């Protein structure tokens, strides 16, 4: 019949002898994540078997996919594939003819970990009568000898023995059972985490302690009334002990205290040593830095050869402008009527409903040249602006977006007759209130929006120009002397690209980009006036990932060399030896090291310095290429080490947190003192009268047991 053993442990949550002594080596962990990405779980391939008695599986049609009917019934009900909780798998899933799939070792490992995650809460699940039988993924697997591959062509050269396979129905039912249990644990898990964070239950280094009875009193005083820990204190005590080796309960029957944590392996990786940060932390940080560099694509952003615009482009990001403050010669996508044109002229336009609107144009009026804009969303916010004049109050007035088309360039307009066609594409009514300052009226937040798509304008005439204006409009004529503003661009204009693959360079749409040529090619003004999808902004976004990776990996200070700054130093050392014009200055290695370090630090602080002409070192494309490639090499050749300063700083910081934690726990024990040995632990009228909720004196006693 086999042997059976029973383990029974009796604990008292509110009694003596329990231990609360968190340490870095017993950090609390559960199973916060699993590696279940499709690329890791699939494809394991599918099983194939030979058709009939074919002598060669290379013959056409010699292999076919295996189904559940190809598995002997003895294999399905074999006790080797059963947990013993049910007589056979047929009691759980229907035995129907289904195709089989091969299960990878990675999938088996992670589903097993999912089962372990549930068992952290076994006592609570039993109390709820949920998942009374522990799931076991291996029970649903059958091991067969077969050809393995995604296709028959691949499988014919890949015969394997003892291959784990499963049917889709069984796989779905297994995952559903896991999900059902996790659903039942949602509030329970939250309440457990609340209990573990209400007071410090972990310490980054060393060890701290507090009387367990004081800890229990604090939890009893502060936990929400609907906390499941109040209703199930026994089950909570066991669940916490499994997660945290610093929480230990005394076996009342045996008089012993045992560490029941099941996370010793993870806890050791999370704990720092006497001179280094935790191994897990160093691994994660290096992984993050490498991921950032990979996302930046150093080969692309340092390329001296043309790169197609869709490849170089990044997901579009909105950009904000005040059109009135941009220089026309820098923002080449803007046009302006010369200020010397002193005679305002009025025009009348319609909207899509046929309503007539009046507006004025004058010297200084600005428009967006839509011929130089990719599909774009415009949102104009006049919030906080005044626009009030002696005879012009913006409150109740309307502002609109107007699209013009004309064969005459906008900067040459002097009369309404020069305009081909125009229409109001959107408008909003303003709300404004008097400002605290005299003669000003502050406009509330507005959202005047327009989505520009070239297809809407039916651009068939290459000589036709298209412009977008934002200005006041009215159903009646606007007297030029009353409203003297040239437009309403003195506001916050947010431009958001509607397409991801188009790139512009200084206002011109391009099909390809030479990334290295962007280095040092912009002035601060032209960069500020560049469109959201400008190649310079794409470069800065990618370069920012390089800067962030350096910051994660590098703890060198100003003027200190590091593996990430010396690529610049190497380039500087060679460039000063090259034949050039003017006086040649030879700097020793100490000076070159400082120059390279300062350039790297400036880049980390503001990655846009590589684009602007003001940067003395990294505005040279050769130095930029050296940095981008050098950082990748530096990270790839790094082991699980940490910077000297980082290690010292983290350890000293951890010690300060340890001291703070112990100080907090000392306050807990002072304000929630444990009863003296000669005093009753519970049930005493004097003690219970001060408690928020009166407890059953036996509520903290639990007998846990299982039979195997």
Curated annotation (Swiss-Prot):
Top-level division of the source organism's lineage: Viruses
Residues with glycosylation annotation: 3, 12, 81, 110, 458, 482, 528, 659
Post-translational modification: Cleaved during the endosomal proteolytic disassembly of the outer capsid. Mu-1 is proteolytically cleaved into mu-1N and mu-1C during the maturation step to generate the ISVP. Cleavage of mu-1 to mu-1C is dependent on myristoylation and binding to sigma-3 protein. Mu-1C is further cleaved into delta (59 kDa), and phi (13 kDa) segments during entry into the host cell cytoplasm. Mu-1 and mu-1N are N-terminally myristoylated. This acylation is essential for the membrane fusion activity.
Stretches for region Disordered: 675-708
Residues with site note (Cleavage): 42-43
SUPFAM superfamilies, per database record: Membrane penetration protein mu1
Keywords (A to Z) from UniProt: Apoptosis, Capsid protein, Glycoprotein, Host cell membrane, Host endoplasmic reticulum, Host membrane, Host mitochondrion, Lipoprotein, Membrane, Myristate, Outer capsid protein, Viral penetration into host cytoplasm, Viral penetration via permeabilization of host membrane, Virion, Virus entry into host cell
GO terms, biological process: symbiont entry into host cell via permeabilization of host membrane
Phenotype for residue 42 to T: Complete loss of proteolytic cleavage
Pfam families associated with the record: Reovirus_M2
Comment on protein domains: The C-terminal region, phi, determines both targeting to intracellular membranes and induction of apoptosis.
Subunit structure: Heterohexamer of three sigma-3 and three Mu-1 proteins.
Family assignment from sequence similarity: Belongs to the orthoreovirus mu-1 protein family.
Protein name: Outer capsid protein mu-1
